[in-house]
Amino acid sequence: MEKEKEKRYQRVDEIQSALLAMASVTPTAGIAAAKVPDTKKILEAAWKKSIAVLPFSNLSPEKEQEYFCDGLSEEIINALSHIGELRVAARTSAFAFKGKDIDIREVGEKLNVGAVLEGSVRKSGQRLRITAQLVNVEDGYHLWSGQFDREMKDIFDIQEEISLTIVDHLKLKLLKSEKERILKRATENHEAYDCYLKGRYFWNRRYEKGFQRGLQYFQQAIEKDPGYALAHLGIADTFGYLGNFSFLPSHQAWSRAEAASKKALEIDPELAEASATLGWIAMWYDWDWTAAEGHYLKAIQTKPEYDTAHLWYGLYLSIVGRFDESIQEMQKARELAPLEPVNPTLVGWALYVARRFDEAIGELRKVIESDPQFAIAYWYLAASCLAKKMWGEGIVTIQKFVELSGESVIAVSNLGYAYASAGMRDEALKILERLDRLSKDRYVGSLWRAAVYLGLGEKNEALENLGKAYLERESILACIKVWPAFDSLRSEPRFKALLKKMNLD
C-alpha cells in the first residue's frame, strides 16, 4: 500500500469500488489473466478491517454508572474512527444492540463488520474493573480479551491500550498522524471527563429536560478544564438542538451555539464534529448557504466516516432544492449508520420535499415498523399523507406524533394544520387556542401558528406570522423554499420577498 497518505485509498468502500471496477475489465491480449487481482480475497481482507464497538455492560453496584459505560464505548469508537484503514460502525448503529442478548455473529452480519468489541465495567468509587473482548465475527472466537483493574485516574491509559490492542490484532498499519490522533487526549482531567460523559448521556436522550441536564454537566466539565474542546462542542450541540426544536427562541439559542462551536474549533482545529455544527448553525440560523456547505464539506473531508455530517449536508441539499444530491448524501449516512432511525427518516423527508410522496410514505412506514417509538417519522409520514389528501391516515399519524413528543409545539401545530387541511375548521381553531395556552409556559414560534392559518386558507394571517418568524429568526423557516405545505403561497409577493431576504430565491 502507498506510504504517502494522499495516494492511499482513504476508506474501505473506495477500495471496494476500485476492485469492482478492476474486476469488470477483461484482460487484454498478451496480459496474463493471473495478474488480475483476486477480488474476493481482497474484499474479504477489507471486510475483516471493520469493527463495531458495542456499549459496555454496567456491572457496577450503582446502576447510575450507565453513563460511564456508554461513554467508554463512545470514546473508543471515536479513537478508532481516526484510522483510515479501519471502518468503524457508527455509535448509533452499535448502540442499537444495547441490553439485547444477541449473538455476536448476528451483530456482525447486521452491521457488516468483521470484528466486534464488547466488554463490561465495574466502577466503585475511584476503582475500576474493565473487561474487553475482541471477537471474530466469522467464527465467533476471541481474537483478544483483557482485564484492567485500575483507578479512575488511569481511564485514559486504558482507552489507549484497548484501541492500540485492536490495531495490533486486526493487523492495521497506522500512519504517524493517525497514532498521534488516537493518543491525543481531549482532557487530562478525569473529573472533567466524567462530567462530559454524563452530559453526553443525557444529551443523547434528545428531549428538553435531557438537553438541560446535559448542558449543566458540559458546563461543569469546562469549569474543571476550560480547554476541553468536546465539552464546548457539547454546549454548542445542546443550544443548537434547543433552538432547532423551538425549545428556546432562536436569538437565545443559536448565538451561544455558535460561540461554543468556534471555541471548540479554536482548541482543536481537526474536530470534524465542530465543523459540522457550524454548518448546522449557518443553515438554521444564519441562513448563509455558502458557509453552511463549506462547513459540511470540511467536516466530511476531515472525518469521512462521520455519518451525521453526511446527514446534515443531505438536509442542507434538500433545503436549497438539490434533491437528487440530497437523497444520495443521506443514503451515505444510512450506509455508515444502518440502524440509526433518523437516517432513513430524513431520506423520507427529502423524498417528501421532492414531491415524491408515494416513495416517502413507503420509506417512513418502514422506519415506524422497525422503531414504533421514533416520533419524528410520524411527522414526515403524516405530511406526506396530507400532501396526497389522505386525510384520515394523516390525522391519525400526527396524533401519534403529538403523543410520542409529549405535546411538543411542533406536533400540536401540525395537528392543527392537518385538521384545517381536512376541512375540520373548528378543531383547527381549537388548536390555535391550545397554542396560546402552551405559550404561557414555553416558547411557541410564529411559524407554527402560520402553518395552522395556512391550512385554514387564511393567507394573510399566515404571511403575517411568517413575517414575525423571520424577525424572530425561527430556524425551521429555512425549509419554506421546498416545503410542500407552503405551495399555496408561492405566487404571493410577500412570500417571494421573504425568500429573497433569506437568499432562497
Where are these regions (language model features)?
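Short, ordered coil/turn segments that flank beta-strands lining enzyme active or ligand-binding pockets
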Residues: 5, 137-139, 197, 455, ...
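Residue-level recognition of oxygen-bearing side chains
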Residues: 14, 325, 359, 461, ...
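Post-kinase regulatory C-tail/linker adjacent to protein kinase catalytic domains
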Residues: 29-42
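Acidic, proline/glycine-rich low-complexity intrinsically disordered segments
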Residues: 39-411, 415, 419, 424, ...
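Amphipathic alpha-helical protein-interaction segments enriched in hydrophobic
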Residues: 409-414, 443-454, 478
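TPR/TPR-like (Sel1-like) alpha-helical repeat modules
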Residues: 467-474, 503
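Terminal, low-structured helical/coil segments at or just beyond the last alpha-helical repeat
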Residues: 480-505
